[in-house]
């Protein structure tokens, strides 16, 4: 069962679902909560490596995964981030989310931004039961013009579904979970698989 706005407000009030900072009620509509872009980004460098072998996370050409992207860069609220056409950037949400073990979240882009070419997640849009932390967005500019992003702009919407029962292995209790208590922009940890 998908939660409606009234349900979302009740889950937040009971602190079963935690979104920090607590969302203003104007951000909770229909079946979603609007969330904002954070101020932490990681950019991919231009490089000479020809490909990444996803089976072992090695880059053909001698580079490691950490060498193909910048360290975390923190932007001020007024500082624009320019996303060129055909470019991918990792960034975090402003909000931190703590999910209970009987709820799954879904991250969706905003239609108004998508119509300008902005994809806010490459494919990873599920927020697992037991998740705790910022959400990393894999933002891609599929449009023809450079897009200007700014910290704290409304960027996405979260919706939530109640599960038939609490999961046996919530994300926060799994030993192999690679992104537990994620704070900021954590790059791919495919090498830990």
From Swiss-Prot:
Gene Ontology BP annotations: dUMP biosynthetic process; dUTP biosynthetic process; nucleobase-containing small molecule interconversion
UniProt keywords, alphabetically: Hydrolase, Nucleotide metabolism, Nucleotide-binding
Cross-referenced SUPFAM superfamilies: dUTPase-like
Reaction catalysed by this enzyme: dCTP + H2O + H(+) = dUTP + NH4(+)
EC number: 3.5.4.13
InterPro entries in the record: dCTP_deaminase, dUTPase-like_sf, dUTPase_trimeric
Pathway(s) it belongs to: Pyrimidine metabolism; dUMP biosynthesis; dUMP from dCTP (dUTP route): step 1/2
Self-association and partners: Homotrimer.
Family: Belongs to the dCTP deaminase family.
Matches recorded under HAMAP family: dCTP_deaminase (MF_00146)
Protein name: dCTP deaminase
Species per Swiss-Prot/TrEMBL record: Buchnera aphidicola subsp. Acyrthosiphon pisum (strain APS)
Protein encoded by which gene: dcd
